């Protein structure tokens, strides 16, 4: 049986890993074993952070909506509660975009939310009967 020589495949595999690890620091960009370990970790971090990014954007949108809502004398949770009660179906991404790009439209949405809230909710906490 003929001997199988794998030098070409092995070098190709190593070259691919080292090419992908370009930009890493120290041995992790020069030594195959270290580069391979770092690449495995990097892929795991990328997978994790693609999912974490979605939550981070949601936090950003909520912060923007809350800032714009407070400028209109209503809190974020009252705004969302009022919009749901008024059957306004707008997601947080679009609501944040409206708050930044079109303040007049956002103010109109705030008024719709206020009309959707029950009467006792609109009274400030210090003046409740």
From Swiss-Prot:
GO annotation terms (biological process): ribosomal large subunit assembly; translation
GO cellular component terms, A-Z: ribonucleoprotein complex; ribosome
PROSITE patterns with a match to the protein in the record: RIBOSOMAL_L20
Coiled-coil stretches noted in the UniProt entry, renumbered to this chain: none
Function: Binds directly to 23S ribosomal RNA and is necessary for the in vitro assembly process of the 50S ribosomal subunit. It is not involved in the protein synthesizing functions of that subunit.
Family designation: Belongs to the bacterial ribosomal protein bL20 family.
Protein's name according to its UniProt entry: Large ribosomal subunit protein bL20
Species whose genome carries this gene: Mycobacterium leprae (strain TN)
Taxonomic lineage of the native organism: Bacteria, Bacillati, Actinomycetota, Actinomycetes, Mycobacteriales
Gene: rplT
